[in-house]
């Protein structure tokens, strides 16, 4: 059974997060909702409130097989600013563990340089954050250990 950590911040796109979490749990994955905000209560970009299972500081990201970054604004910017999360992403990438990002969230990986030389996609308007990437308009693309998705319709 895969262990997935979904990283959450206020202003995330609810469907991108919760649809993915729902499908993964139905498939038998152990999914933990991890807040990077210091609070378990998360408010999505459409003012839907829900609870994270854990705070970032209460978890060990190295225990996860998959790190998942939902999109949405300003949630993506909050994820991008979290140094602990960026360190966990770098470590996971070096270890070849799976990383998935949807909508605006691939911009985090792009700005970290993790997508250079890869094929990736993102929400239209964020392509400039994917420097050194072979950009595609495909809905979902996996290149090596990293999967990126264009947006809500591909959750």
Question: What are the functions of these language-model segments?
Answer:
Residues 43-44:
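Acidic surface patches and DE-rich sequence motifs
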